[in-house]
Amino acid sequence: MTSKAVVFAYHDIGCTGIEALLNAGYEIAAVFTHADDPRENTFYASVARLCAERGIPLHAPEDVNHPLWLERIRQLRPDFLFSFYYRRLLGAELLACAARGAYNLHGSLLPRYRGRAPANWVLVNGETQTGVTLHRMIERADAGPILAQQAVAIDPEDTALSLHGKLRKAAGALLRDSLPLLALGVLPEVEQDESQASHFGRRTPADGLLDWHRPARQLYDLVRAVTQPYPGAFCQVGEQKLIVWSAEVVAGNHGREPGSVLSCDPLRIACGEDSLVLRFGQRGERGLYLAGTQLATELGLVEGARLRGAASGPQRRTRVLILGVNGFIGNHLSERLLRDGRYEVHGMDIGSDAIERLKADPHFHFVEGDIGIHSEWLEYHVKKCDVILPLVAIATPIEYTRNPLRVFELDFEENLRIVRYCVKYGKRVVFPSTSEVYGMCQDPDFDEDRSNLVVGPINKQRWIYSVSKQLLDRVIWAYGQQGLRFTLFRPFNWMGPRLDRLDSARIGSSRAITQLILHLVEGTPIRLVDGGAQKRCFTDVDDGIEALARIIDNRDGRCDGQIVNIGNPDNEASIRQLGEELLRQFEAHPLRAQFPPFAGFREVESRSFYGDGYQDVAHRKPSIDNARRLLDWQPTIELRETIGKTLDFFLHEALREREAQA
């Protein structure tokens, strides 16, 4: 009997998977893929074209986990689901649609290199072997039982592109041998060894920055991991960007400082250990592909000159002052900037539990203090630093009604003082506005430059946060007309690890997801304010921080005088839906047995929860056209993945609390 499959595929390995299924006698009822991104270098084969040529029904929905698509897939009655380099997570309900199971082909030898871009990461890390793995899909990404693996040797001269070709061939061979056995039901499964698991996140173009203090072999590995068709490794020559496409390691560095030009023919650069010959590269994003010797001539390099990369070169790092550095945005942003290698971070906050992991970094400088008290330190560091981020704010709804004057004093008055220091010393300010400034705007998508900012009556004190932020936005804009360099960014419901503390949720002073998780942890009913019908667009903190880092980088000054929404309009969900997805992942979590039974959902009125001064809004959805245009940024992380990371963080925090109390 023919096995029926629904396939989720992209990339040329997606094509390899589809061809293998057809050759093994599977019936493909439908293929789901992605529309090509015009900003991406699509060097790979087209799943869409293959399906058109083979007469296979093809779909490319934004959300394959949407109930409408779930129902359509159920109606196909598939025996199997297969994912071949599909870029979105398949939810539990979708996985359950397959009568005989759902299977994924992953580009590493699991459990090592779970996550994104494994072919790039193995090269960056200098591995000599990788491979492909066929495994059963469970709700946790890349964590299901293994059915088959095929190893691939990594040669010293392999690039990401050549390695991808090897992986494609290995995938074809593995599927050729495995798919017939899977159809017969005789392919055994082996659980993954969690003690050997490693996980790697997505890579960004900024990760290609060359740090000349590192050994030449590590830089060579970075170059080949991100060379064409990827964005490339790079460094700075004065104000010009030098992209390196090909390099080779040469023994010795003549005892010269890292980043020093040892010769121009060939173009040879001293590293922390040995040296690197830059064989081919280009000047800037639109330059010609040139040999290293010609690049040296065109860039005006001479022996003894210094190239600037991470932690090297004569030009100092950009100094970023983050006030509220221990907060959710502050600690994630600090980590991102320090990883970049071009920044020195100075921070103040009243605590440091979330930044303990950063304190050992020599480019991270922290002082415990209060911006309302330590005014001399504050003014000195505004004068000293290049970019100022005043992130200190009271930003939880219950405090808007419980302590409206404190919200005004901190969120407006204290931050106004910082803005005036920036004016006084001519410093650039990147100010955190808020999605709350849009208030009860009726536009379907909130636009930074056109949407009206609408709030409720004076007796609804919940709007004091919104109007405090809006007033500061207007003051900053007015100072901008007098020469202040600024960017306003508006986060839309960012979520992720270290969002809040469970103790904050216990007194009601936390974000919605933390409140919901606390109820699960303590076995109390999940309270849905006014039924939880309010919709928000939730944004993964990694996506949000990447956009914010690009604002700080401010390439070509394009963010000066701009307002930028940072949110994920594709991740719209009601609070009830958020709670339901949390519950599903909670019940499937490995730590589930450590917590009490689920106590159900309970609907409560907003007045009883927040007090008389509260007023809610039905939806809050951003337009992100400005972010796309100014930052070349697009959020990519799905809500299910963000919920999973956030839940996992708080469950482990709850166990740590329990151990500390024992």
UniProtKB/Swiss-Prot annotation:
SUPFAM superfamilies: FMT C-terminal domain-like, Formyltransferase, NAD(P)-binding Rossmann-fold domains. GO terms for cellular component: membrane. Its EC number is 2.1.2.13, 1.1.1.305. The record marks 142 as: Raises pKa of active site His. GO terms for biological process: lipid A biosynthetic process; lipopolysaccharide biosynthetic process; response to antibiotic. Coiled coil: none annotated. Residues 1-307 are annotated as: Formyltransferase ArnAFT. Keywords: Antibiotic resistance, Lipid A biosynthesis, Lipid biosynthesis, Lipid metabolism, Lipopolysaccharide biosynthesis, Multifunctional enzyme, NAD, Oxidoreductase, Transferase. Bifunctional enzyme that catalyzes the oxidative decarboxylation of UDP-glucuronic acid (UDP-GlcUA) to UDP-4-keto-arabinose (UDP-Ara4O) and the addition of a formyl group to UDP-4-amino-4-deoxy-L-arabinose (UDP-L-Ara4N) to form UDP-L-4-formamido-arabinose (UDP-L-Ara4FN). The modified arabinose is attached to lipid A and is required for resistance to polymyxin and cationic antimicrobial peptides. PANTHER family: BIFUNCTIONAL POLYMYXIN RESISTANCE PROTEIN ARNA (PTHR43245), UDP-D-APIOSE_UDP-D-XYLOSE SYNTHASE 2 (PTHR43245:SF13). This is Bifunctional polymyxin resistance protein ArnA. The lineage of its organism: Bacteria, Pseudomonadati, Pseudomonadota, Gammaproteobacteria, Pseudomonadales. The gene is arnA.
